[in-house]
Amino acid sequence: MKCPFCNNINTQVKDSRAIEDDILIRRRRICLVCNSRFTTIEKLLLRSFMVIKKNGETEPFNKQKLLSSILIATKKRPVSHEGINVMVNNIFYELEGKKENAVPTDVIGKMVMDNLFKLDKVAYVRFASVYMNFKNINDFSNIIAKIINEQIL
């Protein structure tokens, strides 16, 4: 790594630590020529993939869009932002690990619903009402009955 102060390439790593859910590595370095210290951050470059929307159009996967939809479902619920970020990262890494270059939105929606079901039942119903395009009160009754049956089993 080139020193930003003297442009020499003789540097040494003094300290390394993983940050942000182990997807970044922060390294403290020292230049062996001018003795300046500086910090670098390494990030794993993940492959990008596309999302196939219900109307057949494709668009690049947007992690922020996924986070926003989950934040809407969990608004004013006793769910930590840390828990939501972990969920978003887990979904992202699972999708990123798939062999396909394009993933349908229903696969992503199912993953979100599975995670929300474990995390918060009210957020699950909120998300389901949009994702499953609820038309009337019976749709809500059906999903709530499903939750009650799952808790009994």
From Swiss-Prot:
PROSITE patterns assigned: ATP_CONE
Domain ATP-cone as annotated: residue spans: 49-139
Cofactor binding remark: Binds 1 zinc ion.
TM segment ranges: none
Cofactors: Zn(2+)
UniProt KW keywords: ATP-binding, DNA-binding, Metal-binding, Nucleotide-binding, Repressor, Transcription, Transcription regulation, Zinc, Zinc-finger
Single GO term (MF): ATP binding
Zinc fingers classed as unnamed: ranges: 3-34
Family to which the UniProt record says this protein belongs: Belongs to the NrdR family.
Purpose: Negatively regulates transcription of bacterial ribonucleotide reductase nrd genes and operons by binding to NrdR-boxes.
The protein's name in its UniProt record: Transcriptional repressor NrdR
Organism field: Ehrlichia canis (strain Jake)
